[in-house]
């Protein structure tokens, strides 16, 4: 299943989303 259609969808998975690629969220590393 797709996590995201656009970057802002990733905020439910990531504190700092980096990109949404092919429905998958990629996050900035947490400090």
UniProtKB/Swiss-Prot annotation:
One of its GO terms (molecular function) is toxin activity. One of its GO terms (cellular component) is extracellular region. The modification Pyrrolidone carboxylic acid is found at residue 1. The modification Proline amide is found at residue 31. The N-terminus is blocked. It is found in: Secreted. Has the structural arrangement of an alpha-helix connected to a beta-sheet by disulfide bonds (CSalpha/beta). Belongs to the short scorpion toxin superfamily. Potassium channel inhibitor family. Alpha-KTx 17 subfamily. This is Toxin BmKK16.
